[in-house]
A protein has these predicted regions:
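A glycine-rich helix N-cap at a beta->alpha junction
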Residues: 85-111, 116-119, 124-127
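Active-site cores that bind ATP or allylic diphosphates and position pyrophosphate for catalysis
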Residues: 71, 75-77, 83, 105, ...
């Protein structure tokens, strides 16, 4: 699969700080002049848009310098991992336009990591601790106070080796003991205070089955896996800055006694993606799915890549957004409106224009011949005239938007109202003559007369009319379901709000999330009408419903009834609300 190019390919864009580091390394001839990166997801959930930012950097850096980016699954926690997530992650990366060099798993290195741990024990650099997790945490100290050494810190090497073997044989229960690296309990870096590097997990692994019972901790597996693979630039988000000295120390230990100034991985950190009105914790996203607050991982309200895909975002729109926000060394909250702006910009270029009526009322042209049908020309995409036109049928009875009619309209109302002319897009100029109501006072029909000399394309069509509305022919359209999606959360910063609610009310995350959910995040319109040109369009087809917004064909569509998802409106409604 070809990689998707940035929107700035026509001119040299300024380099972000990581690109500058890589270029300087190449100029200095480091790492033998090669660049190798990796994207290391844990297969315990679906990728979200925050991962997309990391993916674009990992793969983009490698591609820009003739290097390779490998995919490595960090599968060191078998209780939360599943093959389902592995396959979904691969699909998302490919959809974003990237192809990895090699596919690796941390479990590929379980034996090497085990052997390394054995070596550390023999060198007196690791020991088995039988304290509880609470006791170990209490002995860690604080950033301003040194920790307290474990009473097991100096246990005999042979005893530690024997217990470590028992951890993996199944003789030791989960939580009964751990293997800790012996570093410095007085270090100002809390991660150096004898970190846990192995623990017991009695759960089958999705690749290795029950071969292993003792599993390495992420900090122990990460740097060594990078080293085993030949990674040159290990790119992480900012929360891993305090982990970097430990990363370097373990790499020093694994190749102790050899020259490590070159051909070794170096960790660099960049800011993660924080997005307003968005919660990206996998734990919380999993809760939403399990509790039925959303309709699966690919619910179009979810911040997952598959959710955005189903909603109608294109890979290019996500690339545009990430190009705009860039990479820095400080965290910031990015506006969701900026993401939507990138989506609008992209879909304006690629979406096919069609007419659809979401809140229909019948419009009858009283002086139009009964039984007559005309074929009008509609432009597929004004941004790309080469894509041509399509036919939209016109007849005496049409569906129009209920919001496009007012019986008693104010002076500056330019749509359908008695005595006023309006243009029917791609068709004629008509004058409204009245309406019909039911016993409840609801408008059921609108009446108008057309001017046959004002057909689109004829000289008479040039007559100035301020209002233009869209329509579909009652006899030549499809009934469809339209799902109007909006932001899932009603608060700008749901991560902080979640923590605040939980603290204030002493409640669990689910209770707090229910309080924050936007009740208008999904509005299903079961009876809408769309021109029949849309019939047979495949799921993920990009459309603009003229005058309404951008929409996408949903996978729930059937030959009998199509389903469309609103991707984004034509304008930023939330931005106006918040001003």
């Amino acid at each position: 699969m070809a990689e998707i190019k940035s929107e700035e390919t026509s001119e040299k864009k300024s380099l972000n700080f990581i690109e500058q580091i890589v270029e300087n390394d190449l100029k200095e001839g480091k790492n033998g002049g090669k660049v190798q990166t990796r994207f290391p997801p844990e297969p315990n959930g679906y990728l979200h848009i925050g991962h997309a930012k990391a993916i674009c950097l990992d793969f983009g850096i490698a591609a820009a310098h003739g290097g390779v980016c490998n995919l490595r699954f960090d599968d060191t926690n078998p209780t939360k991992e599943d093959v389902e997530y592995v396959e979904a992650i691969k699909e998302d990366i490919q959809w974003l336009g990237y192809k990895w060099g090699n596919e690796y798993y941390a479990s590929d290195y379980f034996q090497q990591l085990w052997d390394f741990a054995i070596r550390l024990i023999k060198e007196g650099k690791a020991y088995i601790d039988e304290q509880t997790s609470e006791q170990i945490a209490a002995q860690k100290g604080t950033p301003t106070q040194p920790g307290v050494e474990s009473p097991y810190r100096n246990r005999p090497i042979e005893e530690t080796l024997d217990l470590f073997q028992k951890m993996n044989s199944g003789e030791i229960e989960e939580g009964a003991m751990v293997l800790r690296a012996k570093i410095d309990m007085a270090s100002p870096n809390m991660h150096f205070r004898d970190p846990i590097i192995y623990r017991v997990v009695k759960h089958p692994h999705h690749r290795t089955g029950t071969t292993w019972k003792a599993y390495p901790i992420y900090d122990f597996a990460h740097g060594q896996s990078d080293f085993f693979e030949g990674v040159t630039h290990s790119l992480c988000t900012l929360e891993f800055v305090p982990h970097r000295p430990l990363y370097d120390l373990f790499v020093d230990w694994v190749k102790e006694g050899k020259d490590l100034d070159d051909n070794r991985p170096h960790q660099y950190e960049f800011n993660k993606l924080n997005l307003s009105y968005t919660l990206m914790s996998k734990r919380n996203l999993l809760t939403l799915v399990k509790e039925g607050l959303v309709n699966g991982w690919d619910d179009p309200r979810m911040p997952t890549i598959c959710g955005f895909r189903r909603r109608g975002y294109s890979p290019e729109s996500i690339h545009k957004f990430i190009d705009k926000i860039g990479y820095t060394t400080y965290d910031a909250l990015n506006e969701f409106a900026l993401l939507e702006s990138a989506v609008r910009e992209d879909l304006n270029d690629r979406a096919t224009r069609v007419s659809a009526v979401l809140n229909p009322v019948k419009l009858i042209i009283t002086n139009y011949p009964e039984g007559q049908v005309e074929e009008m020309e509609a432009v597929n995409n004004p941004e790309h005239p080469e894509e041509g036109n399509h036919v939209i049928e016109f007849s005496r009875e049409l569906w129009m938007e209920r919001d496009d009619f007012m019986e008693d309209a104010p002076k500056k109302y330019f749509r359908m109202t008695p005595g006023q002319e309006v243009r029917l897009k791609n068709a004629y100029i008509v004058k409204c003559t009245g309406c019909k109501k039911n016993d409840a006072g609801e408008i059921t029909e609108v009446y108008c007369e057309y001017d046959p000399d004002t057909k689109s394309g004829l000289p008479g069509a040039n007559r100035k009319v301020k209002g233009t509305i869209h329509w579909v022919s009652c006899a030549h359209c499809l009934e469809a379901e339209v799902r109007l999606y909006d932001r899932l959360w009603k608060v700008e910063n749901p991560r902080d709000e979640l923590a605040a609610i939980r603290e204030a009310k002493n409640c669990d995350a689910l209770t707090a999330m229910k309080e924050m959910i936007n009740p208008d995040s999904l509005n299903v319109l079961p009876c809408c009408y769309i021109e029949k040109y849309a019939a047979g369009m495949q799921p993920l087809s990009y459309l603009q419903f003229q005058r309404i917004g951008y929409f996408n064909v949903d996978k729930d569509s059937t030959p009998e009834k199509m389903v469309f998802n609103r991707t984004v409106g034509l304008k930023d409604v939330w931005g106006k609300i918040n001003k």
